């Protein structure tokens, strides 16, 4: 956030007469106490609350100040100092005391294209400087084209009021609806991306008025004016342009182009044959020592235009109605965008529902197949289980039979074992008998042998 001098401006400057006022600003003449030099003090009413529409926001004030701090050009007003108090930010600006260019020209009996273009060239030079710094003024109109001093042979143009000027950043799309309806470009009316080209349209309108005293798009109402601008509804009425050169008309045509990309740039405008031809004619006239032939334009209609413009300034050229209109357009654009977003969301939701339905149907078919397969598997398992249970019962019966058989075998084995033991005892007894018999026989045999020997 920029910081300004938190001092009372009247400690440094003596305030004088009011020079002009706008919706949220008052400009007063002032004199610096130390030097006696005269300046213009622009009191900008600060917005107290962000939700309020009274006053200028801090962001807007800082934007204007930052732009003024950056620019230094003979045809652009200069910022000298800045003060701030509780209610206002005060810009101390170069004093531009020569009045409006159109008022100055309207005081003349007649005007030549050459004279008009000398001033136009200064306007182009100032805008060229701004555009070289990517600064768009966005409010070029007769009231903001002033003379530093009209009481000199060659008055100097000064472009003033940078309240809605913007720095155009590459890659950052900028849209807004502001400016003075009579001079705004179609892209502003239609809420389209804005750039330096909008200033060139305004220069086209200013040139048209300068040469004819008529406004190309001005209607009975603001809505009619904006409709004419959007439709690029204008022509070169012979009543107003009978003394205007074709080159001048071509210059205007190349600026009043709806497509910003096809509109003449500031560099191209400075190289346009109409601007360069006047310079060449002036040089030839100086070399030959005679004045070049000049087309003279009546200033009667320009007088009428300036009188009408000043008298209708409060109701017709104030920003209030146009701002309300712009708010309506912004809200309508936001509503349309919201509707488009809702339609996109509805379409996406419908697509999601269809996708989910397709997934559900696919899953349902898969579950159905799986269910059928599982049913078959369950039936097969049930059959296997029944078989297993039957085999189990058979095995149990066989085991029971085997147990019964084992008990019988045990009893039979026991009986056989008993019989075996009895037989073993009997055999043992008989074996002892035989052994005793054999021993007895052997003794008898021995006894017989002994008897024979004797």
Curated annotation (Swiss-Prot):
How might one describe the regulation of this protein's activity? A sequential activation is proposed: autophosphorylation at consensus sites is leading to dimerization of the catalytic domain stabilized by phosphorylation at Ser-50 and activation segment exchange (producing an active confirmation of both kinase modules in trans) followed by phosphorylation at Thr-180 in the activation segment and at other regulatory sites. Phosphorylation at Thr-180, Thr-225 and Thr-265 is essential for activity. Oligomerization is required for full enzymatic activity. Inhibited by pyridone-6 (K00225), a potent, ATP-competitive inhibitor.
Its annotated compartments are: Nucleus; Nucleus, PML body; Cytoplasm, Cytoskeleton, Microtubule organizing center, Centrosome; Chromosome, Centromere
| A cellular-component GO term for this protein | cytosol
Q: What is the effect of changing residue 441 to A?
A: Predominantly nuclear localization
Q: Which residues carry this modification: Phosphoserine?
A: 50, 309, 311-312, 318, 326
SMART domains, A to Z: S_TKc (SM00220)
Record's family?
Belongs to the protein kinase superfamily. CAMK Ser/Thr protein kinase family. DAP kinase subfamily.
Q: What is this protein called?
A: Death-associated protein kinase 3
Q: Name the source organism.
A: Homo sapiens
Species classification? Eukaryota, Metazoa, Chordata, Craniata, Vertebrata
């Amino acid at each position: 956030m920029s910081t300004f001098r938190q001092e009372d401006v009247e400690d440094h400057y003596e305030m004088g007469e009011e020079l002009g006022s706008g919706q949220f600003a008052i400009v007063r003449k002032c004199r610096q106490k130390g030097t006696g030099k005269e300046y213009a003090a622009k009191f900008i009413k600060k917005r107290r609350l962000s939700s309020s529409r009274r006053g200028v926001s801090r962001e807007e004030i800082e934007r204007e100040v930052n732009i003024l701090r950056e620019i230094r050009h003979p045809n652009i007003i200069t910022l000298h100092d800045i003060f701030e108090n509780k209610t206002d930010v005060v810009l101390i600006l170069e004093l531009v005391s020569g009045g409006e260019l159109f008022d100055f020209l309207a005081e003349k009996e007649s005007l030549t294209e050459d004279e008009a273009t000398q001033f136009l060239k200064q306007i182009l030079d100032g805008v060229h400087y701004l555009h070289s710094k990517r600064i768009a003024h966005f409010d070029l109109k007769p009231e903001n084209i002033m003379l530093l001093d009209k009481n000199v042979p060659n008055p100097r143009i000064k472009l003033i009021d940078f309240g809605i000027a913007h720095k155009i950043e590459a890659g950052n799309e900028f849209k807004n609806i502001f400016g003075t309806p009579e001079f705004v470009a179609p892209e502003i009316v239609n809420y389209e991306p804005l750039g330096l080209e909008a200033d060139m349209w305004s220069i086209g309108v200013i040139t048209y008025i300068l040469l004819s005293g008529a406004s190309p798009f001005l209607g009975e109402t603001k809505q009619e004016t904006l409709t004419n601008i959007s439709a690029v509804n204008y022509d070169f009425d012979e009543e107003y342009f009978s003394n205007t050169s074709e080159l001048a008309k071509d210059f205007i045509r190349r600026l009043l182009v709806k497509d910003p990309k096809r509109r003449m740039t500031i560099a191209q405008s400075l190289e346009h044959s109409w601007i360069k031809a006047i310079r060449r004619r002036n040089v030839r006239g100086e070399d030959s020592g005679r004045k070049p032939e000049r087309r003279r334009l009546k200033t009667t209609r320009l007088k009428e235009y300036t009188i009408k413009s000043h008298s209708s300034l409060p109701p017709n050229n104030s920003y209030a109605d146009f701002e309300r209109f712009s708010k309506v357009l912004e809200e309508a654009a936001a509503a349309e965008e919201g509707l488009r977003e809702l339609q996109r969301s509805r379409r996406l939701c419908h697509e999601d529902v269809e996708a989910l339905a397709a997934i559900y149907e696919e899953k349902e078919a898969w579950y159905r197949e799986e269910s059928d397969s599982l049913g078959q598997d369950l039936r097969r398992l049930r059959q296997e289980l029944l078989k297993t249970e039957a085999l189990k019962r058979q095995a149990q019966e066989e085991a029971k039979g085997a147990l019964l058989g084992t008990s019988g075998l045990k009893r039979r084995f026991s009986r056989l074992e008993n019989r075996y033991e009895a037989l073993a005892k009997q055999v043992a007894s008989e074996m002892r008998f035989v052994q005793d018999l054999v021993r007895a026989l052997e003794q008898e045999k021995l006894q017989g042998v002994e008897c024979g020997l004797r």
